[in-house]
Amino acid sequence: MTNMETTAQAGSSVRVWMACLLLIFPTTVIGPKVTQPEVDTPLGRVRGRQVGVKDTDRMVNVFLGIPFAQAPLGPLRFSAPLPPQPWEGVRDASINPPMCLQDVERMSNSRFTLNEKMKIFPISEDCLTLNIYSPTEITAGDKRPVMVWIHGGSLLVGSSTSHDGSALAAYGDVVVVTVQYRLGIFGFLSTGDKHMPGNRGFLDVVAALRWVQGNIAPFGGDPNCVTIFGNSAGGIIVSSLLLSPMSAGLFHRAISQSGVVISKILEDLNAWSEAQNFANSVACGSASPAELVQCLLQKEGKDLITKKNVNISYTVNDSFFPQRPQKLLANKQFPTVPYLLGVTNHEFGWLLLKFWNILDKMEHLSQEDLLENSRPLLAHMQLPPEIMPTVIDEYLDNGSDESATRYALQELLGDITLVIPTLIFSKYLQDAGCPVFLYEFQHTPSSFAKFKPAWVKADHSSENAFVFGGPFLTDESSLLAFPEATEEEKQLSLTMMAQWSQFARTGNPNGKGLPPWPQLNQLEQYLEIGLEPRTGVKLKKGRLQFWTETLPRKIQEWHREQRSRKVPEEL
């Protein structure tokens, strides 16, 4: 059978799988269909709206901007989230909520994943809200799996509304929840003590998951079948929630797309030093944590987001992370829930280069530029300067012309920050007994041709539009809308929605008519996701061996040599 025949057969099988899904979950409606659906929750009544989805008659009830915590205003700006207050009457949940405070210009830089028409919403500190997308058909006695999406954006930018869950809800027959959390200094700056505890952005997501447990049933969701999933920083948060005792029992499956907490770009920092540096930049320097926080509380929120030179990360030795994530992993101190995770084949193809302000340097890149652009990240990893050329040599194995040098830098940055940490994390999960499903997304979306160079392959976050059914979204101003998708890309989106929702439903992405996806075991098999999916073996085996065996050995040898040189000098 040819590849084209195999692809056509797989496409037909997925359509049959989707049709069977709609038969298994019948479309008998309890009560009349209304364009402004209303739902009673323990906190009050909400009124949403109904939207359609392309290529299906199914409708989706959408509820936007529902608060899952009290607004973190005034003295609550740097506090852990508090439970939401009930409201009187009917709350309007039909309009898009504001985004959390962030640098909107930087947000607009990261919008061009697939849709350059994406709306940018207003910003506000009153932003701890979530959106719910639920198929209108409610079957008596049955509850749908719940998929809670955590957006990415380097913990600095992003919003829940930019990820429209209507197509995934309709085609996957799941309830999709998208959440917001405090970003930047509002979510992560810390004095390292009680005056400004860290990890507030993570705690916001925990609060949202608690809200889901107590409130999702009236929307047709099953609180006992919750999957958390996220991309980039969202994937980092998903993996963090797995390790935190605070989120125990709040979810039952997890998906990390291009992001895990052991990434080298996210290390626990000297919290007090970082807080002082930031405070000095806004004229709030103080030797006292209490005074520093009081000064920051007096500032206008929008004035605080203009300062870009601040390191954002998690803190340890608190209620969220009692120990460093690596130690929690090594000690297997986490629940063994089914876990699906993966990367793209060109993580630093374009988007992250643009976000990091180094895209303009990529056209004419010399070997000297390669080392210069890599040096800050390698230094952050505490790599001795004498060892850095070893890393460069490893990545220049395909030549030294400009295109090879550019590709070497892209691969190096992608491996350090995302790919190798994901592979290491998957090994920890497997050793602990989690059912693990690994993927590499390999398809270059056809829309890239409009604004990305021809050398960009499957860029960072490019799978999101397929997971969320971008070709089938009716709102073409949504970040992930993909109206120009080819027929093959539509089929890929249908397949990925089926796989992700099947995983949410059963803890396994395999199903009748879907491409076989092997569970990770000693064979180290994974799924190569593209127009013609296939099974791969030992993803980036050589690079993983370099970072986990070869390079550590060379560093040890270098340190031994340094010590041996010091002994004669001391004598």
From Swiss-Prot:
Query: What keywords tag this UniProt record?
Result: Disulfide bond, Endoplasmic reticulum, Glycoprotein, Hydrolase, Serine esterase, Signal
According to the UniProt record, what class of enzyme is this?
A: hydrolase
Q: Which Pfam families match?
A: COesterase
Q: Motif Prevents secretion from ER: where?
A: 568-571
* Tree of life domain: Eukaryota
Name the cystine pairs.
100-127, 284-295
Q: What is its EC number?
A: 3.1.1.1
Signal sequence extent: 1-31
GO MF: carboxylesterase activity
The residues that the database entry marks as glycosylated are 311, 317, 398
- Predominant location: endoplasmic reticulum
Q: Where in the cell is it found?
A: Endoplasmic reticulum lumen
A GO cellular component term found in this entry reads: endoplasmic reticulum lumen
Name the reaction it catalyses: a carboxylic ester + H2O = an alcohol + a carboxylate + H(+)
- Spell out the catalytic residues: 232, 347, 460
Biological function: Involved in the detoxification of xenobiotics and in the activation of ester and amide prodrugs.
Which family is this sequence assigned to? Belongs to the type-B carboxylesterase/lipase family.
* Protein name (record): Carboxylesterase 3A
Q: What is the lineage of its organism?
A: Eukaryota, Metazoa, Chordata, Craniata, Vertebrata
Gene (name only): Ces3a
